[in-house]
Amino acid sequence: MGSDVRWKLCWENELQLADHVELSDFFLKTYGRHGAFLAKPFEGGRTWAGARPEFRAIGYDAHGIAAHIGILRRFIKVGEVDLLVAEIGLYGVRPDLEGLGISFSLSVVYPLLQRMGVPFVFGTVRQAMRNHVERFCRGGLASIVSGVEVRSTLANIHPDLPPTRVEDVIVFVAPIGRSMDEWPSGTLIDRNGPEL
């Protein structure tokens, strides 16, 4: 896949309306096959589900968008430690390209992550994606952090729901400016905002 995909690395404010329309369609198809609820945030040309990324890596091939990864710098709290991270989210691969590995996405943005000055990349996926993340971590680029729940705010206010939720998700961390040994211990990560 890597040799057939060309990457567009861009800041959020560099995207044009046509980019958002194409990305929205990509997310509707990519997330929608796992349930209409997951696709709903992307209706109407929207290209983010919770927090809006500040940077995107968009992979294109002869058939259009092949893959996408969003990045957002933010402070999270791991246990009692405030920590700057680059959160990775809005990850998607076109269904016909799945199973070819996700490590290519991180390797494409690794130089940018170094320039951002973040000590770690942080990401979460639902439990159903465990096999994909384990494959990615086997390459040594990241580690799964077990025994941790993540608290996030909801992206929108709902009068019948609390403003935050705590989830048992797969947490993965990739060291960028520090070693993995320096990741703080704790059983709760406060995202202090909506997920990416």
UniProtKB/Swiss-Prot annotation:
Keywords: Acyltransferase, Cytoplasm, Nodulation, Transferase. GO terms for cellular component: cytosol. It comes from the Bacteria. Pfam families: NodA. GO terms for molecular function: acyltransferase activity. The keyword Disulfide bond does not apply. It is an enzyme of class 2 (transferase). It is found in: Cytoplasm. InterPro entries: NodA, Nodulation_prot_NodA_CS. Its EC number is 2.3.1.-. N-acyltransferase required for nodulation. Acts in the production of a small, heat-stable compound (Nod) that stimulates mitosis in various plant protoplasts. Belongs to the NodA family. This is Nodulation protein A. It comes from Rhizobium sp. (strain N33). The lineage of its organism: Bacteria, Pseudomonadati, Pseudomonadota, Alphaproteobacteria, Hyphomicrobiales.
